[in-house]
């Protein structure tokens, strides 16, 4: 018989930098999970990624205090800001443009995000990424 699931925990943790301090410690502690075991496993799986890149993770907590976790792709906004070489999006996205990305950059981001997007093909994924970029005040050339 399958283990009884007691809950899901969704967090965004910088790659390779999981530690017992908030938000990780309290979120896992209230479910009675081993915090250090998670931190070591997460850091081991994310060591190949760019350090500090926020990685969404979904932790499944079981009744016997064990857990599994699934890593997602970095948020599209983080990848877009990195491609446009800016720190934050525009406070008035449709009025003030703060940067621009090319279609090739949007395609690269779409390929990275493809496992987590609901888009049927790459072109639809590129349009999704372009829409996210426009809502941040970033111009997308060629889309």
From Swiss-Prot:
Gene3D superfamilies: Ribosomal protein L11, C-terminal domain, Ribosomal protein L11/L12, N-terminal domain. GO terms for molecular function: large ribosomal subunit rRNA binding; structural constituent of ribosome. GO terms for biological process: translation. PROSITE patterns: RIBOSOMAL_L11 (PS00359). One or more lysine residues are methylated. GO terms for cellular component: cytosolic large ribosomal subunit. Pfam families: Ribosomal_L11, Ribosomal_L11_N. NCBIfam families: L11_bact. Belongs to the universal ribosomal protein uL11 family. Forms part of the ribosomal stalk which helps the ribosome interact with GTP-bound translation factors. This is Large ribosomal subunit protein uL11.
């Amino acid at each position: 018989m399958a283990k009884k699931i007691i809950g899901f925990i969704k967090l965004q943790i910088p790659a390779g930098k999981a530690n017992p301090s908030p938000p990780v410690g309290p979120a896992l502690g209230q479910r009675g999970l081993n915090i250090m075991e998670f931190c070591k496993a997460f850091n081991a799986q994310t060591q190949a990624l760019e350090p500090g890149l926020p990685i969404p993770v979904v932790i499944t907590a079981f009744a016997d205090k064990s857990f599994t976790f699934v890593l997602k792709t970095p948020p599209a906004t983080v990848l877009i800001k990195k491609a446009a070489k800016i720190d934050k999006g525009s406070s008035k996205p449709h009025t003030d443009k703060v940067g621009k990305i090319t279609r090739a950059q949007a395609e690269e981001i779409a390929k990275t995000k493809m496992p987590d997007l609901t888009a049927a093909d790459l072109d639809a994924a590129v349009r999704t990424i372009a829409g996210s970029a426009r809502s941040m005040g970033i111009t997308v050339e060629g889309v």
